[in-house]
Amino acid sequence: MANAYGFVGHSVPTMKRAAQFQQMGSGFCSADSISKRVFCCSVVQGADKPASGDSRTEYRTPRLVSRGCKLVGSGSAMPALQVSNDDLSKIVDTNDEWISVRTGIRNRRVLTGKESLTNLATVAARKALEMAQVDANDVDMVLMCTSTPEDLFGSAPQIQKALGCKKNPLAYDITAACSGFVLGLVSAACHIRGGGFNNILVIGADSLSRYVDWTDRGTCILFGDAAGAVLVQSCDAEEDGLFAFDLHSDGDGQRHLKAAITENGIDHAVGSNGSVSDFPPRSSSYSCIQMNGKEVFRFACRCVPQSIESALGKAGLNGSNIDWLLLHQANQRIIDAVATRLEVPQERVISNLANYGNTSAASIPLALDEAVRGGKVKAGHLIATAGFGAGLTWGSAIVRWG
């Protein structure tokens, strides 16, 4: 029986118990989520007419069919300017060995005044459409996963316009920092399974170089700019390519990684009688990225493998079933620690961190696109992917390519 949201009741597994929360030693929390895959339904080309002799004058309830989604195209783009560790050693007290040993990073790309993040995202999206052989006019949603939009109100509509989508498909931003792309994938799946959408572009793009303190060697060495995209397409439920996911947030960890709003200028007093104070408000901007690296490292090494194990369990799989482990490219030590915890050998771990640094929401689709175009990831391969970062927010998804 279909409910008001278009979901079929009997095909949605019920929760056997209430979510169980437990507090970690560091104060972070975890929770058990709804298990197993959920197949949703949407209308198939309207309703059936009543049979001959049927006394009802209204059309019957539209038929419903199960729907799945699959990843069918990828693309990526990055700025032209490459900044090496040696380049950074000229502006802060550091060197190539110090950076590469602690992070695994050797180079990163940085946007200049001649480039824009929106243009990078558009290029990546076009490449994904070309690989999938889908016309821009067949796209019915654009999701821009970013924490650094070039417009306060979001960049997705500008990308939709640049792509030339003539049917005005829905386009909006998702802000979840380095977890953004995974949340975008899950959001796309929900729109397809329950909302009747067919071709959704999920773009991860960030330019964190604009929010870096280039005198702080603890953070300026980490970040780069880039964009990556995938096309998520509807399919029959039997071909579904999103097997399971696991998503979490913990606002208590915000103190360890943030770029908080700051007030600029001076108070603009209104009148002289003191009846109105602090108005108009001061103009605001965001601070540079502030990070407690040790705490973020501990958080990632603890929560990410837990999340992936949870998603694998929901899918009825284990680490030996996956072909590739693809994590947010934040730090090679984190990637190695998670792979060791999951017993995934290094030859099945995708990493391009050395070339691009931490590109936030772009890191997973960028690495995926390079792996697909390089022949590593092939149709039918299973990928365990996970994002983690500011919020604190983290999540994982088990997906099949193609």
Curated annotation (Swiss-Prot):
Query: GO molecular function, one example?
Result: beta-ketoacyl-acyl-carrier-protein synthase III activity
Q: Which reaction does it catalyse?
A: malonyl-[ACP] + acetyl-CoA + H(+) = 3-oxobutanoyl-[ACP] + CO2 + CoA
Q: Which Pfam family name is an example for this entry? A: ACP_syn_III_C
Q: Which InterPro entries match?
A: ACP_syn_III_C, ACP_syn_III_N, FabH, Thiolase-like
Which residues does the entry assign to the active site, renumbered to this chain?
Answer: C178, H328, N358
Q: Name one GO cellular component term.
A: chloroplast
Q: Which UniProt keywords apply?
A: Chloroplast, Fatty acid biosynthesis, Fatty acid metabolism, Lipid biosynthesis, Lipid metabolism, Plastid, Transferase, Transit peptide
Places the protein is found: Plastid, Chloroplast
Give a short account of what the protein does: Catalyzes the condensation reaction of fatty acid synthesis by the addition to an acyl acceptor of two carbons from malonyl-ACP. KAS III catalyzes the first condensation reaction which initiates fatty acid synthesis and may therefore play a role in governing the total rate of fatty acid production. Possesses both acetoacetyl-ACP synthase and acetyl transacylase activities.
Protein name, per record: Beta-ketoacyl-[acyl-carrier-protein] synthase III B, chloroplastic
- Protein species of origin: Cuphea wrightii (Wright's waxweed)
Task: Please name the gene that encodes this protein.
Answer: KAS3B
